[in-house]
Amino acid sequence: MKAIQGYHLIRPEDLHWRPSNLMRIPNADYLERTGSENIGARLWRLPPKSANTLHKHIRSEEFYFVLEGTGRMRVGDETLTIPKYGGVLVGPEQLRQVFNDTDDEVLWLIVGAPEELEFLQGSKSKMDLSLIYPVDPKQLPNELAGIEWPTKS
């Protein structure tokens, strides 16, 4: 992995918001245009009564930081409540899932390193997705029982 040279300024208008593949959560990748191979950073805007994937990483640590609202998160067998401007560092191999069981949007900044290059566009190898999704990634936490997410459009 090579380090970038100099710096990259990222303005809010540079961000491209799109729904995530599995759970349709709006997100914007801060570093996709920088070419960084060492770190990843995304904004995730969780709508009310929604959840992101239940997953883990092979070698990446992730720092979850709540920018707006009150964050809720499953880490292993625990459910955490993270206040605005609070954060959680999660190591690799630890199953995790951010979710929103409130009636308001929650905005997260999630930063991970090292970047897992096998997921980058143009990767030469096929990734074994069972390594990051050892269980059904779309399963919702008990706090969202009876909720359908992602919603059918």
Residue ranges and their predicted role:
Residues 50, 59, 78, 94-95, ...:
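A generic "binding-loop/recognition-motif" signal
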Residues 37-42, 52, 60-62, 69, ...:
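A generic structural signal for short beta-strands and their flanking turns/coil linkers
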Residues 1-39, 53, 123-153:
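A short, N-terminal "cap"/entry segment at the start of jelly-roll beta-barrel domains
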Residues 43-47, 56-74, 111-114:
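Short, conserved beta-strand element in jelly-roll/cupin
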Residues 89-90, 103-122:
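A short hydrophobic beta-strand segment most commonly corresponding to one strand
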Residues 77-93:
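Short acidic-glycine-tyrosine-enriched beta hairpin
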